[in-house]
Amino acid sequence: MQLLEGHIQHYAWGSHDVIARMTERAAPTTEPEAELWLGAHEAAPSRLLGDGAQGHLDALVAADPQRVLGDLAARFGGRLPFLLKVLAPVQALSIQAHPSAAEAASAPAGTYGDGWAKPEAWYALTDFEVFAGLRPFDDTRALAELLDVEALTGHVAAATAASEPARALLATLLHLSADEQADLADAVVEACRPLAPAEPALDAVVRIAEQHPRDIGLVVLLTMRHVVLRPGDYAFVDAGVLHAGVRGVVVEILANSDNVVRAGLTPKHIDVDELLRIADLDRQIEPERGVLDEGWTCFPASTPYFRLRTATLAPDTLPVPGEDQPRILFALDAPVEVVGSGATVRVAPGQGCFLEAGEQAYVRAVAPDGAVSDAPRPRVFLAAPGEA
């Protein structure tokens, strides 16, 4: 077992207090803190903590993948297949889609950093506002008519005759000149303003326009479903699904990859052709609740890369499942102890504990002085490989 310190990503859209408070540091922070990564991705691997510990989790895995990963070493090329994050946006993220493994492997050289798919899933810690998946095209057409922006209704009408109207409309919007995109975004936002108080999706577009003025992504958002995940909701986001987080706090579990293509709300390059190639415009996200199994709330994912479980700890000990697999346990709200064969690791809120394949362990709540306690009751999240 190894105590882990997550890596904080200071993206501009992040909160100045959420992750700091979660990890028991002073807030507000000078820099924004957007994401906390727990895993072995080479871009931001977790640091190993504890007596005699040195280095980072990626190096630990690479030194002996067969021991650390067990039977998964060959299947995933010696890489830990999952990555666990906390996302804390106070501004909208870019509109994104991620490739399947086949799409990543067949893309032109340099498009992606690796040949992996990048499905992901969110567990909401607070209300989490997001745009994800597309509206039915008839709904997009009705919304365009309601907004009555001539350029937009013209683009929608032209796309209607296509075999895939939604894809045709997306292609049209993203292939407009920069000036045409900016003018259309301005006109659409102004048309949204009087309707925004009664329409949450339009209200979100108006708010996001303050963060990303004149961005074509504001128009793309109108073609997407507006969803608010409630605390405890879980949503699986498969490869190809367009999505953009807006605000809130989630635990995110994903394949151990950073492959991404963007569709707006970003100053970064938009690879329109690749986006149109990989975007799955029919698939949606469906918020769900997990199933209780031996003290853990378990969430399914139709992917071999990851599976998420969570539990709120009582005074009793709770066995950590999946002993034949590598796992990361993440603590929130109060410290916990992970007890293994001959070793005990104390995990503070915001820290993680890595368990190698073959390691048996259980977890229990502890008071700051080490005594077993039932208040406050910590929450733990367990990231493990999937079973698909």
What are these model-derived regions, one by one?
Residues M1-P197, P267, V272-I285, L308:
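Transition-metal
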Residues A62, Q66-G70, R214-R230, P321-G322, ...:
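A short beta-strand-loop-beta hairpin characteristic of the jelly-roll/cupin
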Residues L93-Q96, P119-V130, G248-P267, F306, ...:
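A short hydrophobic beta-strand segment most commonly corresponding to one strand
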Residues D179-L221:
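Active-site cores enriched in adjacent His and Asp/Glu residues with nearby glycine-rich loops
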Residues R193-E210, T297-P300, P315-Q325:
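Short beta-strand/loop turn elements enriched in aromatics
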Residues M224-V237, V241-G245, G340-A361:
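Short acidic-glycine-tyrosine-enriched beta hairpin
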Residues V249-C298:
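C-terminal, non-catalytic macromolecule-binding modules
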Residues P304-E323, G358:
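Conserved short histidine dyad/triad with adjacent acidic residue
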